[in-house]
Regions:
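Catalytic-site microenvironment of enzymes
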Residues: 1-249
Length: 249
């Protein structure tokens, strides 16, 4: 009997030991899972946050070109040349910010065919076709202004009268223009329902009239690379501000 009691006691101790060991192993498993699961979750969050954003595309339209010189400045500068130079500077500015840029023209070559009867209309249609093909997020057409009174000056942005996004983009660029020019620029954004590009553009488009070639002081400035770069920077900053506000950047 004594031997039986001893054996029973040993069996009881063994069972207790096994249970304690099992509990210990279970606790280790729970602790290890508690450690591994957050790490896996964190890794997943990090992977999601590194998904690259969609590359944005901005179309830049340098107005006029080839046989169409646009306005001729009081100092004989040609609008088409100033438009192209400013557009190139805007392109350079935006590309440094990671924006994809498409231009309707990068030199003075015509956008129409020599056989086209209405070359101006063919030119406008070609610009619209480029916009359609590149599927840009927004479009900015660069021009210079003119008026009968030489005293009138200052940059101004036009947008399509029924375009909510166009109005926002115009306001953003106009604000940037005002910072470049200063308080003396009293011009404000203006709706329009007649300009061909504004009416037919498949995306929000604005027309930036960068200054008046009929104003001697402004015409001289617009012919200089330094001022062209300042105007281009204002356009670029206005574009970036609009894209940021619309949560596209």
């Amino acid at each position: 009997m004594g031997n039986v009691n001893i054996l029973e006691k040993r069996m009881i101790k063994y069972e207790v030991s096994v249970k304690q060991t099992a509990k210990f192993i279970m606790m280790l498993l729970i602790l290890s899972l508690a450690y591994v699961m957050p790490a896996a979750t964190t890794k997943k969050i990090q992977q999601v946050s590194t998904v690259p954003k969609k590359t944005l595309t901005v179309l830049l339209d340098a107005g006029h070109g080839a046989d169409d010189s646009g306005k001729v400045g009081i100092n004989q500068v040609l609008e088409k040349d100033i438009n192209l130079e400013i557009a190139k500077y805007v392109k350079e500015f935006l590309e440094k910010e990671g924006i994809n840029v498409v231009m309707t023209r990068e030199d003075d070559s015509p956008l129409y065919q020599s056989s086209d009867r209405n070359k101006k209309l063919a030119d406008m249609k070609k610009r619209i076709q480029i916009m359609v093909d590149c599927d840009a997020d927004i479009a900015v057409s660069i021009h210079q202004n003119s008026y009968t009174q030489e005293s009138v000056k200052g940059p101004q942005v036009f947008y399509y009268k029924d375009s909510v996004e166009g109005k926002k983009l115009a306001a953003s660029i106009q604000e940037a223009f005002d910072l470049v020019i200063g308080d003396e620029n009293t011009r404000t954004i203006k709706p329009n329902g007649e300009y061909y590009l504004l009416v037919h553009s498949p995306m929000p488009l604005v027309i930036c009239e960068c200054g008046f070639l009929s104003n001697w002081e402004e015409a001289k400035l617009l012919a200089t690379p330094t001022y062209q770069k300042s105007i281009a920077k204002a356009i670029g900053q206005g574009i970036l501000e609009y894209l940021a506000n619309e949560k596209r950047l």
